From Swiss-Prot:
Source species of the chain: Conus vexillum (Flag cone)
PROSITE patterns noted in UniProt: I_CONOTOXIN
Entry's family note: Belongs to the conotoxin I2 superfamily.
Ranges in a coiled coil: none
UniProt name for this protein: Kappa-conotoxin-like 2
Single Gene Ontology MF annotation: potassium channel regulator activity
Entry-linked InterPro entries: Conotoxin-I_CS, Conotoxin_I2
């Protein structure tokens, strides 16, 4: 009976650790100057191909407005 209780406890502990690692790994973010996407967000600031405080307007023939 003691062996079964220990095995179940270890199994539950492993599941809890895996859930914790999943939360830590999926909630990562990137500092300024690093490439970003909507799926790989910036820690602070906004994503304009790279993490920045402010997006600048691009001038020229193919100017685009970025929020």
């Amino acid at each position: 009976m003691m062996f079964r209780l220990t095995s179940v406890s270890c199994f539950l502990l492993v599941i809890a650790c895996l859930n914790l690692f999943q939360v830590v790994l999926t909630s990562r973010c990137f500092p300024p100057g690093i490439y970003c996407t909507p799926y790989l967000p910036c820690c602070w600031g906004i994503c304009c191909d790279t993490c920045r405080n402010v997006c600048h307007l691009r001038f020229g023939k193919r100017a685009t407005f970025q929020e």
